[in-house]
Amino acid sequence: MINKIEVLAADVDMTLSAKSSPLPEITIQALKELHKRNVKIGLATGREITEAEKTKGMFWTLGFEFDFIIGMNGGMIYDRNLNKTFTMDMLSVEEMKEILTFLMPIIEENKVSVNVEGNQLHNVMNINNHLLDMSKRRNIPLIDKTGDIDGFCEKPVYKFLFRTDSKTTQLIRNKVEEHYKGKYQTIETFPGTIELMYSGFSKGRGLEMYCEWNQINLEHTIAFGDNENDNSLLLTSGWGVCLKDGNPNTKALADDITDYD
């Protein structure tokens, strides 16, 4: 068990709260108590770090803002106190087109929903209920570019998101690993959703960088998550905690599991 907590990092969606939902009151009180004790509190999310993410404390009526944010599954880091940031490179338009061309037979055959994050690009392929729900929750438009690779790839982005069934997501992952041999990684962020981005980034590496910037021993960090993209975060921290209803593989590697989901 961890004896001294200097840093807490927590996944957002389905860990701290349901997607785009308020925090439970018990979580608010716990975060406030940790803040009073000068614990550095941060978010670890797959999302791009925007002003909305930077003001999550206000949105959740905490009375303070988070000390740091690990975004884009470790591809972005924001340290509020040091006013320091790190941002990964974007996929080029040429790379985007090559990736979609390679995966298009699978996308078309299985009606895989595709969208991206970065550069405020809202182009999508194969609109389904999951994309419609995401659009409503985050108040962003969907621009249908199904089958139009050139039209879809208007400008560079950080990552692709593919939404489909588990069998097809595994097929995509196998094809990407076999063809690109480590240039890109695929990460499950939610059952039925995988993301494709450059390799070499993870939430765990993001936590390492934050601690390096602030000269904090990783042994004094605690992390919370629920899915595959949180695995590195839980393993890197001094004490990794998985949600009770989390991914079985994530639960297996955690130091502890919550009593409640």
Show which residues each predicted segment covers.
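Active-site phosphate-binding/coordination module
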Residues: 25-130
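Short active-site oxyanion
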Residues: 38-42, 66-67, 159, 219-221, ...
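Conserved acidic, metal-coordinating active-site core of Asp-based
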Residues: 102-224
